[in-house]
Swiss-Prot record:
This is 3-isopropylmalate dehydratase small subunit. It is an enzyme of class 4 (lyase). CDD domains: IPMI_Swivel (cd01577). GO terms for molecular function: 3-isopropylmalate dehydratase activity. Heterodimer of LeuC and LeuD. Keywords: Amino-acid biosynthesis, Branched-chain amino acid biosynthesis, Leucine biosynthesis, Lyase. It catalyses: (2R,3S)-3-isopropylmalate = (2S)-2-isopropylmalate.
């Protein structure tokens, strides 16, 4: 699975309340949530992301409360993948389960500049930035299957169909 796009960069400790503020959690429409993603840091993020972007961030991206809407809002806004030095474990699982690729890359914010154009091999974790190849951590075969299906629900529907035949 290859994903490519321009980079928007954030720092360390981007928590789920920054990704999607709590006041929007009562809404379930992904497109509505997308309009408010990253609002506390960049009120214009939704417009920038709508063209399809890769977020590059530092340590513990997605920390804080378990908020599935964070991954849903990012994906709906046009975020194709998140590359970070580390992820909060629950955000990592929520992202995969909602079809949003996440790649761990040591020193991510030092290795990749804002507005760079990157090409990511999600399976191997390799990231091409210009003529430089960075080695991130790939994902498991199961996680790749879930991503390729579009998320856990689509994966389960697919498996149910396969098992019926």
């Amino acid at each position: 699975m290859i994903i490519e796009g321009p980079v928007i960069k954030f720092g360390d400790k981007i928590d789920t309340d920054i990704i999607i503020p709590a006041r929007y959690l009562k809404y379930t429409d992904p497109q509505y949530l997308a309009q408010h993603v990253m609002e506390p840091l960049d009120p214009e993020f939704y417009k920038k992301a709508s063209k399809g972007v890769i977020i590059v961030a530092g340590k513990v991206f997605g920390m804080g409360s378990s908020r599935e809407q964070a991954a849903i809002a990012l994906k709906a806004a046009g975020v194709k993948a998140v590359v970070a030095e580390s992820f909060a474990r629950i955000f990592y699982r929520n992202a995969i389960n909602n079809g949003l690729p996440v790649i761990t890359l040591p020193n991510s914010t030092k290795e990749i500049d804002e507005n760079s154009y990157v090409k990511i091999d999600v399976e191997t974790g390799e990231i091409l930035v210009g003529n430089k190849v960075l080695k991130g951590k790939g994902i498991t075969e199961m996680a790749l299957e879930i991503l390729q299906a579009g998320g856990i629900m689509e994966y389960l529907k697919k498996m149910q169909t396969v098992n019926r035949n």
